[in-house]
């Protein structure tokens, strides 16, 4: 009881104390709420009118009683915001381009100043008191005339900015740079293509031309032949039996180039271990026969035998038997070969190299008649007149041909020099008979088994396909495509060291590869007797030229 009284005297009953606490908390909550309201009511006049409570009078200068329906946004406000946004965007764009100009360190610093000035103009315009008042207003009293003037000035600056950016855009726009670079590359490629066409045509003209020294040499040799016929004729003499001896090493060289043919013979004899066992069958045309006869009578060849004949001596080679001679009578074919106007030749660059009339020369097609030209021989080595022999070649006669006709070095690598590059595989006959991925081989040094040739009837096969190609539908002329066809399944690949090609067009052939080669071939337009020959390879050929002969010296050949 005493304790109970003490509780009453000390503060009253628990119920009364709890009620006091509840009232105190409620009063605090109301006070906090009123403080929050007073904070919002004291906000700047720029705050949204929607935050003001209706029916309450405030001391912030508004002093009017408004309802939610009474407060409406000015219809010009969105337009003002849009104009301001356009100005801000273009100001930022101008600043960005100014930054790009500085980063790129443009030589023309005027652009930097122009973009910086444009940016300042936008800033000055936006901060102009008259126009800033429009944007800072509560939206109730925007003057349309001032707004129109503001819009006009902004549009004028936007127009000017776009013009400046359009003029300078290519300095910054990557896509424009890429497109401009592509256009430049395309134009340069066009120029390069035209230059290549002109170069190819000029190279073709040079390759077909006869150097003055070579022409002089042929004329002086012919003059010598006419002046002293008894010294150089073989008429009335018995034909040496070595020329038909199958036990000797026989070579076939078909050429109308006196100096080139002599280099082939000189180099082969020089590198032969037993030169007296080697027989060279040189065939030329009637016009160069006298010069060839004199050339090969002027010196001894260490006992080697050299036979010089004209193609006309082989009477079976006539237009009734040889398809090429028959096709030569075609007006269209003559036009294809001999119409060498620059505008026509450069339009058809694919076939330009085939327009050389040498492809019509019967000398170029004699290789398909070897068994008939040399009926008593079993094997023969064919050499082009643009080769140089660097080693003894008798090892070729020791190769087992496995019943094949043609021993040749293959030239394919990757997708290059496949049959598809030499023949028209869209033609059904070609498509049916041959594999487009078959590996091509090279003419220039070919070892032929003449017995196998006769057995396989390769000449008849050549005639069959040559007649079918009268309109050039199967291949674009030349002798390699018909050779690839004729010896399609009868070619034995030889080691590449026997025959290295490309010295007439490829400057990147390694000297090690050349030194290890038995025969090097100057195939291409840059023949070693021409001024356009590659200097790094030319000495391989010139060291076999008979510069000590008076006729060669008289013509200043090679100077």
UniProtKB/Swiss-Prot annotation:
Pathway(s) of this molecule: Glycan metabolism; pectin biosynthesis
Disruption-associated phenotype: Embryo lethality. Reduced galacturonic acid and xylose content in cell wall. Altered cell wall porosity. Reduced vascular bundle.
Name of the top EC class for this enzyme: transferase
Expression by tissue: Expressed in roots, inflorescences, flowers, siliques, leaves and stems. Localized to discrete cells of the vascular tissue and subepidermal layers.
Residue intervals annotated with topology Cytoplasmic: 1-20
Membrane topology (UniProt): Single-pass type II membrane protein
Primary location group: Golgi
GO annotations of cellular component type: endosome; Golgi apparatus; Golgi membrane; Golgi trans cisterna; mitochondrion; trans-Golgi network
Keyword Ligase recorded: no
EC number: 2.4.1.-
Record topological domains on the Lumenal side: 42-559
GO molecular function annotations of the record: glycosyltransferase activity; polygalacturonate 4-alpha-galacturonosyltransferase activity
Subcellular localization: Golgi apparatus membrane
Pfam families listed in its UniProt record: Glyco_transf_8
Glycan attachment residues as annotated in the record: 121, 318, 344, 424
A biological-process GO annotation: homogalacturonan biosynthetic process
Function: Alpha-1-4-D-galacturonosyltransferase involved in homogalacturonan (HGA) synthesis, a class of pectin which plays a role in cell adhesion.
Protein name: Galacturonosyltransferase 8
Organism: Arabidopsis thaliana
Gene: GAUT8
């Amino acid at each position: 009881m005493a304790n109970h009284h003490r509780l009453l005297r000390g503060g009253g009953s628990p119920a009364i104390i709890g009620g006091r606490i509840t009232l105190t908390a409620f009063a605090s909550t109301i006070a906090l709420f009123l403080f929050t309201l007073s904070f919002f009511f004291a906000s700047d006049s720029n705050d949204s009118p929607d935050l003001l409570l209706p029916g309450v009078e405030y001391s912030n200068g508004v002093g009017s009683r408004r309802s939610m329906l009474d407060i409406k946004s000015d219809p010009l406000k969105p337009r003002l915001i849009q104009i301001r946004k356009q100005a801000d965007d273009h100001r930022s764009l101008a600043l960005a381009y100014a930054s790009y100009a500085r980063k790129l360190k443009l030589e023309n610093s005027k652009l930097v100043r122009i973009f910086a000035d444009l940016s300042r103009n936008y800033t000055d315009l936006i901060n102009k008191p008259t126009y800033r008042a429009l944007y800072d207003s509560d939206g109730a009293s925007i003057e349309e005339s001032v707004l129109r003037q503001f819009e006009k000035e902004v549009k004028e600056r936007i127009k000017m900015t776009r013009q400046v950016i359009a003029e300078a855009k290519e300095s910054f726009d990557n896509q424009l740079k890429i497109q401009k670079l592509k256009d430049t590359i395309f134009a340069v490629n066009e120029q390069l293509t035209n230059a290549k066409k002109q170069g190819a045509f000029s190279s073709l003209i040079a390759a077909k031309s006869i150097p003055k020294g070579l022409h002089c040499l042929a004329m002086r040799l012919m003059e010598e032949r006419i002046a002293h016929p008894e010294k150089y004729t073989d008429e009335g003499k018995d034909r040496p039996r070595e020329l038909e001896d199958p036990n000797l090493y026989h070579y076939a060289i078909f050429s109308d180039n006196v100096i080139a043919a002599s280099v082939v013979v000189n180099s082969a004899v020089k590198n032969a271990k037993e030169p007296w066992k080697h027989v060279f069958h040189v065939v030329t045309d009637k016009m160069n026969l006298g010069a060839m006869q004199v050339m090969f009578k002027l010196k001894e060849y260490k006992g080697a035998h050299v036979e010089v004949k004209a193609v006309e001596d082989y009477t079976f080679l006539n237009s009734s038997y040889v398809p090429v001679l028959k096709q030569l009578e075609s007006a269209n074919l003559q036009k294809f070969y001999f119409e060498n106007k620059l505008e026509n030749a450069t339009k058809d660059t694919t076939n330009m190299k085939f327009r050389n009339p040498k492809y019509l020369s019967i000398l170029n097609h004699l290789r398909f008649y070897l068994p008939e030209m040399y009926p008593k021989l079993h094997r023969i080595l064919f050499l082009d007149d643009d080769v140089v022999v660097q080693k003894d070649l008798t090892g070729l006669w020791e190769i087992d041909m496995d019943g094949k006709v043609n021993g040749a070095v293959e030239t394919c690598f990757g997708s290059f020099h496949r049959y598809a590059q030499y023949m028209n595989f869209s033609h059904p006959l070609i498509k049916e008979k041959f594999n487009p991925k078959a590996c091509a081989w090279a003419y220039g040094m070919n070892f032929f088994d003449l017995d196998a040739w006769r057995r396989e009837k390769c000449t008849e096969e050549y005639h069959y396909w040559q007649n079918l190609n009268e309109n050039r539908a199967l291949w674009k002329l030349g002798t390699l495509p018909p050779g690839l066809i004729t010896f399609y399944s009868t070619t034995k690949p030889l080691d590449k060291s026997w025959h290295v090609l490309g010295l007439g067009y490829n400057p990147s052939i390694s000297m090690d590869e050349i030194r290890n080669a038995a025969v090097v071939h100057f195939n291409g337009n840059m023949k070693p007797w021409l001024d356009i020959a590659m200097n790094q390879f030319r000495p391989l050929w010139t060291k076999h030229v008979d510069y000590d002969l008076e006729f060669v010296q008289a013509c200043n050949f090679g100077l």
